[in-house]
Swiss-Prot record:
Naturally occurring in which organism (per UniProt): Geobacillus sp. (strain WCH70)
Enzyme class: lyase
Keywords: Amino-acid biosynthesis, Aromatic amino acid biosynthesis, Cobalt, Cytoplasm, Lyase, Metal-binding, NAD, Nucleotide-binding, Zinc
Protein name: 3-dehydroquinate synthase
Name of the encoding gene: aroB
Function of the protein: Catalyzes the conversion of 3-deoxy-D-arabino-heptulosonate 7-phosphate (DAHP) to dehydroquinate (DHQ).
Family: Belongs to the sugar phosphate cyclases superfamily. Dehydroquinate synthase family.
Disulfide bonds: none
InterPro entries, per the entry: Dehydroquinate_synthase, DHQ_synth_AroB, DHQ_synth_fam, DHQS/DOIS_N, DHQS_C
Length: 375
């Protein structure tokens, strides 16, 4: 079991990483001073309930009062209705300020359960137990939120967990599309801050099937280390932490416009990163070898163009709702070079022209468009 220290200006906490480490959870809780008899509320989703929940409850039942709340699987669960239902469950189970919430699942569960913890009785402890590759990003750094019909993650808080317990054995049950979705965030971390890691990914992860064993654990560790280094510098996203939104300006707009769940978060972010590289080459008058990136992304099955059915003007309006925007002006995270990110404001006219060009030029290269994969 590896241990990584996550450090911010307000808190320091451990991240435990390894195969089969969930069996050590009772010991970890004792190490974190959660005494016998503490009330635990496990928030998870339908998929994890069927696969692992009974095992997790049995693991903890000897030492703790264990309660559960199960949400629907999928992005739609990051809603006010589910948030309110979780709060109701916490009240009915009699949780107090010494109780603990366990966020057992992927990014949706982590975001929702973390926001429940941040606001229940003005804040109680929680621990992230991620079960997806995507959650290597969302489980670290304390950003918790639910969605609003007008925008993704618009209602939330910065609230750090007590710990992260990342057992990569859970990733074996992931379908290919979810593994691909999480890998997009791994690529993101390399592109914004670690050129050497980017080169390693190109050499070692030739296909999604390579994401297993030591390679998988290394990917997770490197991604977490990049995320931790950024969060250490900027916990509340006032500066460089916004670089972690590389690919998310268009990505979130696509998710919102298509309807949450129609396109996986990772597919949307991958397409957003490709567009950001496309824009970077034109804004900075440089070559990042865009065509090579497009081919590379395609080998993993990522979409490489904006679905032709989507209206570009509507997409722009969604992008203007991004949290990085200022006074109605879109601010995108671009690359000056691999490993060197920067936030750049872009006017509507420039963005519309680039969106249209990107949609037109890449449309013929993406087989998903021809069969209306998302629309």
């Amino acid at each position: 079991m590896e241990q990584i220290v996550i450090e911010t200006k307000t808190k320091q906490y451990p991240l435990f990483l390894g195969e089969g480490i969930i069996e050590s959870l009772p010991d970890i809780l004792r190490q974190l001073s959660f005494s016998k008899g503490t009330k635990l509320l496990i928030i998870t989703d339908k998929t994890l309930e069927q696969l692992y929940l009974s095992r997790l409850c049995a693991l903890l039942a000897n030492d703790y009062d264990v309660y559960t709340y199960v949400i629907p699987s999928g992005e739609e669960a990051k809603s006010f209705e589910q948030y309110y239902a979780c709060q109701t469950a916490a009240l009915q189970y009699g949780l107090d300020r010494k109780s603990l919430i366990l966020a057992f699942g992927g990014g949706v569960v982590g975001d929702l359960a973390g926001f429940v913890a941040a606001t229940y009785m003005r804040g109680i402890p929680y621990i992230q137990i991620p079960t997806t590759l995507l959650a290597h990003d969302s489980a670290v750094g304390g950003k918790v939120a639910i969605n609003h019909p007008l925008g993704k993650n618009m209602i939330g808080a910065f609230y750090q967990p007590e710990a992260v317990v990342y057992d990569i054995a859970f990733l074996r049950s992931l379908p290919e599309k979810e593994l691909r979705s999480g890998f997009a965030e791994v690529i993101k971390h390399a592109l914004i801050r670690d050129r050497d890691f980017y080169q390693w990914l190109r050499q070692e992860i030739r296909e999604l099937a390579d994401l297993k064993g030591e390679r998988l654990q290394y990917c997770i560790k490197k991604g977490i280390e990049v995320k931790a280094s950024v969060v250490r510098e900027d916990e509340k996203e006032t500066g460089v932490r916004a670089h972690l939104n590389f690919g998310h300006t268009l990505g979130h707009a696509l998710e919102n416009e298509l309807g949450y769940g129609a396109m996986t978060h990772g597919d949307a972010v991958a397409l957003g990163m490709l567009f950001a590289i496309f824009v970077s080459e034109r804004v900075y008058n440089i070559s990042l070898d865009y065509d090579r990136f497009s081919s590379w992304f395609r080998t993993y099955g990522f979409p490489v163009s904006i679905p032709k059915q989507l209206n570009i003007n509507r997409l722009l309006e969604k992008m203007k709702g991004d949290k990085k925007a200022r006074a109605g002006t879109v601010r995108m995270v671009l690359l000056k070079d691999i490993g060197m990110a920067e936030i750049k404001p872009l006017d509507d006219e420039t963005l519309l022209a680039l969106l249209r060009k990107f949609q037109r030029e890449e449309g013929e290269n993406d087989p998903r468009n021809s069969r209306c994969h998302y629309c």
